[in-house]
Amino acid sequence: MKLVYTDIRNPLTQYLTEQTATFAEQGKRVFYIAPNSLSFEMERKVLEYLPEQATFDIIVTRFGQLARYLMIDRKEAGQPLDDVGLAMIFFRVLSQFEDGDLKVYGRLQTDFGFINQLVALYKELQRANMSILDLEAMDSPDKQADLVKIFLAVTDILSKEGFEHQSKLAQLTGLVETGQLDEQLKNIVLVVDGFSRFSAEEEALVSALNERVSEILIGVYASKKAVQATYAEGNVYQANVDFLRQLSAQFQTKATYIGQEPVLDSIGKFSKNMEAYYDYSGTMIDLTPADQEKIQLWEVVNQKEEVEQVATAIRQHVHQGARYKDILLLLGDVDSYKLQIGKIFDKYDIPYYFGKAEEMSHHPLVHFVESLERLRRYRFRAEDLLNLLKSGLYASISQKELDLFESYILFADMKGQAAFSRAFSVNGRADYDAEVIKEKRLVYDLTVLEPLRAKIMEPLNQLFKAGPQSGTALLEKFMAFLEAIDLPKNMEKMSRNLSEVEQEKEEQVWKSFTHLLENFHQIFGKEKLKMDDFLAILQAGMQASHYRTVPATVDVVNVKSYDLIEPHTAKYVYAIGMGQSNFPKVAKNTSLLTEEEMEKVNLVSASSSRFDLVSRENIKKNHAAMMSLLNSATEQLVISTPQIYNEGEDSLSPYIKILQKMGLKSEERGRIKTLSPQDIGHYKSLLSRLIESERPSLETEEWEGQRAFWTVLVRHLKKKLESQSIEIPTITGDIASKQLSDETLAALYPEDKPLNLSASSLTNFYNNQYLYFVRNVLRLREQESIHPTAFQHGLFLHRIFERVVMDQSELDFDQKVDKAILRTRDEAEFAMFYNQDADARYTEEVLDKIARSSATILRDNDLVEIDGQEKSFRQDKALVFDLQNGKSVHVNGTIDRLDTLQINQAVGVVDYKSSDQSFSVGDFYNGLKPQLVTYLAALQELDETKDKPVFGAMYLHLQDPIIKLKDTKNLEQLEGAANTSLVYKGLFLKEESLGLNHFYQTRNQLYTEDEFAVLLNHNQELYKQAAMDILAGRFAINPYTKDGRSVAGEQLKAITGFEADRHMGMARRLVKEAKRQDWMERMKGGQD
């Protein structure tokens, strides 16, 4: 073995490649070994440094692949298993244990998080060159007993069923140690580059090869000063120096320096200063302004702005002639930056490549498998079924059918497999207006929905009815299910029009899926298994699968984690996210074994076996990564720190603080928006692409006489956008609606037809004009539900009261109420709402009590005679108000009940309410409560009431009064309190209301004939003003405010974007007056 090192400013890989070429010329077979994370980059570098830039005699590979090359002619020791297959073996073993077999891990037996940790421990033991029996020294007997029991059972299955139970490296080491490869090895040379330590498994292999191969050459970066130092703890080169010293002692060889002493350039000065800082020698080298230009420190507001700044700089480099492949982007945290880089680099048209395996978790096939498993585990939740259908891989269902199906199951609140397996029968109404209720117009066409339900459910029912059986039988049923839903065809259809790169990803996803099914067949083929476990295994396997793509071209910006960097990697290097959170990185132990347990095991293990303790390596690894980063760029290095990282403030890295002590200044980027050369380079490159795409159209433009190139370009683009009806919106803090076009208004409101309004639509208009537009023009509705709402509750009570009032039989009052309740319950539409589940039945019981309590006011009030229920004024009976423009307004509505006073035959209106309501002249004036006055206006026009006097219009709150016993002293007071809760509230005409009893709350609500006329006149004005705005197509976004500080009206935030704190100026302020007389004067004078 030969150990070499060189200064970090020297090209170590070039030196080793030259030595490698010499070995190849001597007829040796050379393996150039690199770490897993650097093997592809190292191969590129080695080929670049070779004079002919190609060779068959040198193979750049990894330790793991070396075993394949040297054992290629050997019979496989067993069938190989990947991590997913190994996880299946662990699941199979754990599912066979009985309760109580495992003392520590008994509750985690089939938890896939625990299983993945077991797989990780299995591989840790292989890297540590240990077996599970070596864990005896960890002093946790119950934990060790559980692990031994699990791992021995796993090893037994692997051996009996012909799977590999040793890693490739362990197999190779065994063959080397037994001399079976001696003839093959004597002409082999190993060159090792990029390592700062070996695992115990790698070290055992190197030790076995050392006496048998022609040569082993290991090279690292270190300074002479560090290698010759007696104390290396904390030194920036400690990792590499410890590595050299350990190998030197083990293999009795001395490390030698190769190459010349490098010229002290700018980065060399930074490196020397950093080394001096950490070895406390204090010999700092002064830096010139030219030196300081080689490394830039950026401070940027947030992560998004960091990526924006890097993208702009890359465009500038490319504009100046650089290639994308000359630029390297390093990330402090890959996961938190990945999404931003994808969006922003695509926007800037920068090709890039993540050199990291990508999870498949976002792919529709993974969503399909996840939804199928959740559908089974959670017993057919609607959301899981919808997610399954929305994957796009389940049968051939159009978007329109899917929308219809989703709408129906949300309406019907479908839950459970039984509900989905039955034919759809319940239905709902499209609207809740009285006319539509009378027509019983239904929403859903069940003749369309039922075949769709059957198409969806038949394959699922067939799959899920499978009981516990062999893995092979379950797999056959699953394959039949996939064929029934056309999964292969849907996958092919989904990938048909994708790019070549995306199609390659689709292919890898499909290979992972089929490989997973093959593994399942091999491992569980003869095992008895439940469908739940089969789907759980399938889901875990797909979630753990990754794919790696190769860029379509080598001219891309490479993106990777900064701790995988090597010196002299690219011309321009940008390292972002380098705050204290990531720079340095603090690795944490995630193993099932604690570091204390690992250390105890290490103390009693042989020298060839050991666990790597990550916390012990943190300082050494971070110093090495920092030095590699400083020396990574050959032209320029930029290190960027976000002030806000992952929504929290991030401090400066200690390494950056040291660079600042050396004289480097941090530059704030992204805040000052000035025109710079970088901006010009960026815009020119983008505009040149735009001009190229528009060149045919631009050739027809008149160029002569134009003052500037930009004038023509902007004019052309505006014309192009206008021709395609594309508008670039101006971003402001205001929101506004557009006036409807004449064509739209003509279709909505024909000249020969009146405008139809009602009290509820008028309330919508004065609540927020845009609310009227949404509800009464667009007719948008919230998702309907089979669960009864306040409307159904009110309708239910209305029907009961109607039947009680109209019942002319000889039954006593309570019997009439009982009869009315029973008949109303039996109506099909109410039975649908109130018999579906326990909640609905309880609601019906509550309504039953309310009906019985509220009915007492009919029984005990003998002042009035009820004339009838639901008097409508519609069509030819509607109220008619003529407008100045020649059109008319027809006001439609339905009165719940008409009463006649026995003493004077005056009529009154009763409106049933499910909440407490009263008449407020202020609310009426502002258009918020026109209902009672509108009904009074209707009484003057209806044939049966126009010649009769009117005593008032009132609300009746239908309720079951709750009285606090502490507020009453005896039963008489209790009854009185109950009676005062059931009263009529509204407005009453003073002259006609004489003699009203305690059931009518007339205090402060008596109006004279003159005041009544004022109310009627103002009511008409409210309708006319609203009609004029509606017919003009103007619908302002103006929810009302009572106090000018908060908004009480409907804001419709999701549709309008209205925010009370930003748009309060757009809210309609209600008029305020203190006294009724002031309101009357205002209405008389027509004041706003």
From Swiss-Prot:
<keyword id="KW-0227">DNA damage</keyword>
<keyword id="KW-0234">DNA repair</keyword>
<dbReference type="GO" id="GO:0000724">
    <property type="term" value="P:double-strand break repair via homologous recombination"/>
</dbReference>
<dbReference type="InterPro" id="IPR011335">
    <property type="entry name" value="Restrct_endonuc-II-like"/>
</dbReference>
<keyword id="KW-0269">Exonuclease</keyword>
<dbReference type="InterPro" id="IPR038726">
    <property type="entry name" value="PDDEXK_AddAB-type"/>
</dbReference>
<comment type="similarity">
    <text>Belongs to the helicase family. AddB/RexB type 2 subfamily.</text>
</comment>
<keyword id="KW-0547">Nucleotide-binding</keyword>
<dbReference type="Pfam" id="PF12705">
    <property type="entry name" value="PDDEXK_1"/>
</dbReference>
<dbReference type="GO" id="GO:0005524">
    <property type="term" value="F:ATP binding"/>
</dbReference>
<dbReference type="Pfam" id="PF21445">
    <property type="entry name" value="ADDB_N"/>
</dbReference>
<dbReference type="GO" id="GO:0003690">
    <property type="term" value="F:double-stranded DNA binding"/>
</dbReference>
<keyword id="KW-0540">Nuclease</keyword>
<keyword id="KW-0378">Hydrolase</keyword>
<protein>
    <recommendedName>
        <fullName>ATP-dependent helicase/deoxyribonuclease subunit B</fullName>
        <ecNumber>3.1.-.-</ecNumber>
    </recommendedName>
</protein>
<keyword id="KW-0238">DNA-binding</keyword>
<keyword id="KW-0347">Helicase</keyword>
<dbReference type="InterPro" id="IPR014141">
    <property type="entry name" value="DNA_helicase_suRexB"/>
</dbReference>
<dbReference type="InterPro" id="IPR027417">
    <property type="entry name" value="P-loop_NTPase"/>
</dbReference>
<comment type="subunit">
    <text>Heterodimer of AddA and RexB.</text>
</comment>
<dbReference type="InterPro" id="IPR049035">
    <property type="entry name" value="ADDB_N"/>
</dbReference>
<dbReference type="GO" id="GO:0008409">
    <property type="term" value="F:5'-3' exonuclease activity"/>
</dbReference>
<keyword id="KW-0067">ATP-binding</keyword>
<dbReference type="GO" id="GO:0004386">
    <property type="term" value="F:helicase activity"/>
</dbReference>
<comment type="function">
    <text>The heterodimer acts as both an ATP-dependent DNA helicase and an ATP-dependent, dual-direction single-stranded exonuclease. Recognizes the chi site generating a DNA molecule suitable for the initiation of homologous recombination. This subunit has 5' -&gt; 3' nuclease activity but not helicase activity.</text>
</comment>
<dbReference type="GO" id="GO:0016817">
    <property type="term" value="F:hydrolase activity, acting on acid anhydrides"/>
</dbReference>
